[in-house]
Every structure is written in structure tokens, then in C-alpha cells.
């Protein structure tokens, strides 16, 4: 499997890509091409073109959850495919994969809508949509986890605004947050978007779904923005016990958390343009 970072908060020196506080990864495995999240704007398309990645040939668009920094680029992706149809440019019709609540409206008092700008219905006009709480295998080795069980008390979080479910406002604990997992030869690679479900919870879910205890790498947003001392210490302790080969914290992982995670001795730099391969 090959993974390239299309969008992150950071870009590399002398790599002239666009960064934004968002996330988007391009993944290739066994001739399948997957876009994991779409960032906040058109930046992922701009960066993909500079990397010579043809996003018109996707098989899946997998969404980690519904927040703006992971779904608002969908509008630009729809436009890309509309223009391909109009100009008769060769393209596929990818399937959108997500949790059943990924397109529900999410509201925050000071900002208004912080969920997807497009409803499931509107997305379905352009791409087939498959929403599932259960795991869904994208390839023989790459799985969309579905809804994540939240086991660890230290990863409990406050709600982020509200979510509208069946016309009712409910506290939003972002239960739509999920991840992808790749079954490499030496163990699991866990690919997270924002880890609202809790990084350790997600890894435990990955081990259960894949029936594999070995975990070799984790990449993505770890949802460690000003975490409590208890949370960061227990997270680091959990990760140390996994005996990982590499750790790629990015997006919603603040500097102090990265410094704490560096105790593992395996933290790697992440930025737009990063290209990683696992076998």
C-alpha cells in the first residue's frame, strides 16, 4: 500500500504545495485508488495535480467523519467530476464510504454549520453512497472500520456542538468518527482522520476487526489539542506497549503532544507531499 499526504496543516520545505488546517490522503492498494477525506477546500485537488495524481480515477472516497476540515472539499471534487463528464475526460465513478451520520448537519454556536456542506442526497446524485456502522473492506487488506467502540475512560471527550438526528438536536460526540486499517505483512497500519473516537479506542477496534494484535504504524490526526496530563500520559503509555515501528502524528496534534509522543522514539515528520509505502 502506498499513501501520500495531499493535505495537512504543514508542508515540507522546498515542496511548494498548499497547506491548510485539514486532512486528505491518497491511498493506492492492489490497483484500487482511495481518497481518504477531502480537506477544507480545493487544496487537495491542487496538490494532487502537482503530484501527478489523477483524482478522476478514484474507486472510493472514504470519509473519517463529517467535520468541515475533512468534508468541505467534496464540493470541489463534485465539480471536478462534473467537468470531466462535460468535457468527456476519462473518469471512474467512485463510491463514497462513511458512517450513517457522516452527512448529518453539525452545528457549533459561534460558527454555525461545521458539518458537510453536501447532504447524502446531493452527494448521491454524483457518486454512489455506502454508509455503514459495520466494517467494510475496500480491498483484501484495507478496511473501513465503521463505528468505533469507546472503551478507554481517559479518552472520553466533551461534545463538539450538536448534531441533528431525525430533526432533533443532540450533543455531538462525533460517533461518526472512524478510520482505515491496512493489514501489512508485519502488522497493522492504522490511518486516522481526527481520532475523535480516541486514538487508543480506534487501535483496539482495528485489532479486533482485523484479528491481529501487531500494530506497526499509525498516521493521521490524533485529536490531541491541549489534552489533559492524564490523557496524554496514558496515550503515550499505550502506544509504547504496542512496539510500533513508526508514528506519524499530524493535523489536530499540537506541538506539546508531539513532544510527549516523541518519547516513543519513533515519531516521524508529516507534511503535504509525504509518500509512504507498507507491504
Located regions from the model:
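Conserved beta-strand hairpin/beta-sheet module of binuclear metal-dependent hydrolase folds
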Residues: 1-51, 173, 177-192
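Active-site metal-binding loops of divalent metal-dependent hydrolases
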Residues: 8-10, 38-41, 66, 100-102, ...
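Cap/insert and terminal regions of metallo-dependent hydrolase folds
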Residues: 60, 66-73, 173-179, 183-271
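Short acidic, glycine/proline-enriched helix-loop-strand junctions
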Residues: 84-94, 256-278
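Active-site neighborhood of divalent metal-dependent phosphoester bond hydrolases
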Residues: 100-125
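Active-site-proximal loop/helix segment associated with metal-binding centers of metalloenzymes
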Residues: 110-114, 134-186
Amino acid at each position: 500500500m502506498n499513501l501520500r499526504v495531499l493535505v495537512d496543516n504543514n508542508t515540507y520545505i522546498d515542496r511548494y504545495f498548499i497547506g491548510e488546517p485539514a486532512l486528505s490522503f491518497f491511498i493506492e492498494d492492489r490497483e484500487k485508488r482511495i481518497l481518504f477525506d477531502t480537506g477544507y477546500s480545493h487544496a487537495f485537488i491542487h496538490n494532487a495535480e502537482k503530484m501527478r495524481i489523477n483524482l478522476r480515477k478514484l474507486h472510493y472516497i472514504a470519509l473519517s467523519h463529517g467535520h468541515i476540515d475533512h468534508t468541505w472539499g467534496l464540493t470541489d471534487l463534485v465539480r471536478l467530476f462534473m467537468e470531466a463528464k462535460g468535457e468527456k475526460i476519462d473518469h471512474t465513478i467512485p463510491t463514497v464510504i462513511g458512517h450513517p451520520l457522516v452527512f448529518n448537519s453539525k452545528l457549533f454556536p459561534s460558527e454555525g454549520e461545521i458539518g458537510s456542506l453536501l447532504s447524502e442526497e446531493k452527494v448521491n446524485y454524483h457518486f454512489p453512497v455506502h454508509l455503514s456502522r459495520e466494517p467494510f473492506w475496500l480491498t483484501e487488506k484495507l478496511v473501513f472500520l465503521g463505528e468505533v467502540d469507546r472503551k478507554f475512560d481517559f479518552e472520553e471527550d466533551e461534545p463538539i456542538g450538536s448534531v441533528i438526528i431525525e430533526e432533533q438536536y443532540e450533543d455531538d460526540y462525533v460517533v461518526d468518527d472512524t478510520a482505515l486499517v491496512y493489514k501489512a505483512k508485519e502488522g497493522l497500519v492504522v490511518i486516522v482522520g481526527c481520532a475523535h473516537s480516541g486514538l487508543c479506542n480506534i487501535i483496539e477496534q482495528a485489532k479486533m476487526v482485523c484479528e491481529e494484535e501487531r500494530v506497526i504504524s499509525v498516521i493521521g490526526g490524533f485529536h490531541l489539542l491541549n489534552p489533559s496530563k492524564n490523557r496524554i500520559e496514558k496515550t503515550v503509555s499505550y502506544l509504547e506497549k504496542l512496539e510500533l515501528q513508526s508514528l506519524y502524528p499530524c493535523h489536530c496534534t499540537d506541538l506539546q503532544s508531539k513532544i510527549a509522543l516523541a518519547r516513543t522514539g519513533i515519531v516521524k515528520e508529516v507534511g503535504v507531499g509525504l509518500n509512504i509505502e507498507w507491504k
